[in-house]
């Protein structure tokens, strides 16, 4: 494969070693032209969409290309943990199976099917409150035209005030650099008009929703407001909530 494909495989392998598994989607289609029950393998060279989610739990760079129902362009396969039980009624129903590195549905550059997911969760009691705008209908990704800012305003309603320890943002690209700033009691229409309490540089390696611990905890009193402002020097893709 290309250098980019090799790099992508290495990143996925690193995440499997770190987290134990990855979530992916691929196109599952029954049929002897795709399934090889003798080798518990699957390879579909023609479909770029997806219809089924599975977990990637390992890999074998030397898995023979001949061990697929149709010979793949090269050796190598991901070890997949499926959710359809252990009964051997087809390779994709045998608990685990091998998915070719070259399967079209996990290599499309035209859709989001190349995404792999991990969930790095924290303890539920790590924070007392989550300040958020909830209830929207879905998410979309916007890509800016050059440098940009993203911000939001929050009001402190807790009696006794609040201590802000972390903020969050959704990013739709790899290797993103930005400056994160927190402003206290900004004026309406200008979220950077308040008192600057904190500014820190942030690097986000992977796309997704990230919780960013602040370099210092910030205290607010009931009735205060604060603005969270991200500044990007270059074009950036952001996850944005939407109601329509």
For each predicted feature, which ranges?
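Active-site-adjacent substructure of cysteine-protease-like catalytic cores
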Residues: 2-75, 79
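Beta-sheet-rich sandwich/jelly-roll-like modules and their strand-loop junctions
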Residues: 105-192, 196, 218-223, 232-244
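Short strand-edge motifs at loop-to-beta-strand transitions and within beta-strands
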Residues: 208-210
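Solvent-exposed serine/threonine-rich low-complexity stretches and specific carbohydrate-binding patches
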Residues: 193-205
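Acidic glycine-/aspartate-rich tracts in secreted/extracellular proteins
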Residues: 28-31, 59-64, 83-88, 174, ...
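Acidic Ser/Thr/Pro-rich low-complexity disordered segments
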Residues: 34, 87-96, 186-195
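Conserved catalytic-core surface of thiol
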Residues: 60-62, 66-143
């Amino acid at each position: 494969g290309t250098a980019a494909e090799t790099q992508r495989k290495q990143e996925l392998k690193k995440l499997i070693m770190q987290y134990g598994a990855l979530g992916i989607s691929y196109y599952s289609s029954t049929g002897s032209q795709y399934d090889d029950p003798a080798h518990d393998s699957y390879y579909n060279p023609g479909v770029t969409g997806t219809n089924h989610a599975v977990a990637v739990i390992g890999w074998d760079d030397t898995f023979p290309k001949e061990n697929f129902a149709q010979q793949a362009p090269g050796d190598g396969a991901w070890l997949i943990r499926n959710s359809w039980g252990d009964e051997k009624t087809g390779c994709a129903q045998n608990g685990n199976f091998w998915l070719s590195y070259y399967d079209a549905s996990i290599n499309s550059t035209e859709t989001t099917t190349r995404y792999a997911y991990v969930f790095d969760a924290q303890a539920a009691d790590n924070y007392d409150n989550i300040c958020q705008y909830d209830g929207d209908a879905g998410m979309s990704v916007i890509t800016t035209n050059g440098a940009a800012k993203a911000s939001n305003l929050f009001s402190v309603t807790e009696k006794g005030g609040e201590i802000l320890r972390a903020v969050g943002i959704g990013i739709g690209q790899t290797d993103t650099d930005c400056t994160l700033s927190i402003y206290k009691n900004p004026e309406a229409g200008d979220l950077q008009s308040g008192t600057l309490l904190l500014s820190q540089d942030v690097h986000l390696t992977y796309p997704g929703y990230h919780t960013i611990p602040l370099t210092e905890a910030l205290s607010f009193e009931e009735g205060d407001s604060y603005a969270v402002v991200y500044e990007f020097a270059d074009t950036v893709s952001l996850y944005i909530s939407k109601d329509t």
